[in-house]
Amino acid sequence: MSSYICFHLKRKGVEKKDLFLSYCRSTKIYQCFHDSGIPFYYSNPEPFAEVTENMLNDILSDISLERQTHQDVLKTLYRLSDKSVVQSVLELEDQLRDKWIGEIECTDDLVGAILWREGEVRELDRVEVQIEFLKDMLDEMKYDKDDCPFEGIYANIV
């Protein structure tokens, strides 16, 4: 049985698009974008090597403030890219279908989350190590302290 750790990053004063593109450039772990509570999955970068910044902009422009279903978002991916590009997203969806963490509250402060899929998580120190890894990853993004868009990190474990 798998466990899922969802890291939520709180922003301060940056555009959602800029923050999302920063995710795509900076991390090699599973990614999840939330807008109006809608989970939006990206897999690790290899299957998405051909996804361009323009494509991401198109995807983001298609995500309106109106509530869309997860299938609506997947259809957007299909429309904008070759089906093979999103295959790993569909595989992830299959794995999460019965174990997705459910509704995630989205506020003005919460613009995204990173979904980390691991084996069973039983020891607190393993969770702490993963949180430290995420903090290190953010440090590598080389934001000046005053310009860093993230002001808090917390995690839900399911």
Where do the protein language model's features map onto the residues?
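Acidic (Asp/Glu-rich) sequence patches and key acidic residues
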Residues: 1-149, 154-158
